[in-house]
Amino acid sequence: MNTIVMQADKKLQEKIRTDLAQHHISNNNPYVVFSAKISGATVLLYTSGKLVFQGSNASHIAQKYGFIEQKESCSSESQDIPIIGTDEVGNGSYFGGLAVVASFVTPKDHAYLKKLGVGDSKTLTDQKIKQIAPLLEKAIPHKALLLSPQKYNQVVSPNNKHNAVSVKVALHNQAIFLLLQDGFEPEKIVIDAFTSSKNYQNYLKNEKNQFKQTITLEEKAENKYLAVAVSSIIARNLFLENLNKLSDDVGYKLPSGAGHQSDKVASQLLKAYGISSLEHCAKLHFANTKKAQALLK
């Protein structure tokens, strides 16, 4: 199945919604804000502005909205070397921990990964994630780190060592370091960019575990490198497992994301158990904490 991914500005998002309104279909993925099926292609618009076209006619439909076919050629060429790719999941969710994964992928892995349908975890359903993540964990060398909400709240605050960016630098660096310590030799190390290279390097100076290999931060790297896509999927599965465990711990279904539903559930937890319940399952510095407290007034 052909898959085309592009970024849509607000104008293009509105055009997609208008043009394809009569072809609208339902979609259970919480990250999908609009979906449609037309002429052999499924169109998915995500909260991030990511626009995905899937199906035999994906390229043709995508070109109507500005996709240029030649753009795809460079990404396959850039992967013909051993690569370590990293990604994180959970940084945008009030509830749940922060999962960071580094994966080592070589060209010989590509056929298997494409057969599994590996892609950016945000374009896959949770069911698909849960299905293929265990297969990836067995087949691909990787290091997975999970910072629980409780630990996150201990290290991320104005009075502590980290902020929301520096803690991700620490986790990405540690995951890569552990893979390198195992003897893997990538020709390139790619991080799905969450800050500027300059900012990353400034925070990196504070880390104990250092290595000499050059790091590249690229936006939308999960769409360009299979190693990053693998990490995205494993990290997403780890985050979902943690979110389910935390839901069991507190007796409430904890939603992913940081929307109004998170405010409502947080206010229910505050009323039932107090702030200690949120310390256990949520990232307290998010605005949701104050919004939840306001709902109780």
Curated annotation (Swiss-Prot):
The reaction(s) this protein catalyses: Endonucleolytic cleavage to 5'-phosphomonoester
Signal peptide: none
Record text on cofactor binding: Manganese or magnesium. Binds 1 divalent metal ion per monomer in the absence of substrate. May bind a second metal ion after substrate binding.
Disulfide links within the chain: none
EC number: 3.1.26.4
Record's subcellular location: Cytoplasm
GO molecular function: magnesium ion binding; RNA binding; RNA-DNA hybrid ribonuclease activity
Keyword Signal annotated: no
Alphabetically ordered keywords of this record: Cytoplasm, Endonuclease, Hydrolase, Magnesium, Metal-binding, Nuclease
Cofactor(s) listed in the protein's UniProt record: Mn(2+); Mg(2+)
Keyword Nucleotide-binding belongs to the record: no
Chain residues that bind a divalent metal cation: 87-88, 192
Any one GO CC term of the record: ribonuclease H2 complex
Residue ranges occupied by any RNase H type-2 domain in the UniProt entry: 81-297
Main location: cytoplasm
Pfam families cross-referenced by the UniProt entry: DUF3378, RNase_HII
GO term, biological process aspect, one: mismatch repair
Family: Belongs to the RNase HII family. RnhC subfamily.
Function summary: Endonuclease that specifically degrades the RNA of RNA-DNA hybrids.
HAMAP family per record: RNase_HIII
Protein name as catalogued: Ribonuclease HIII
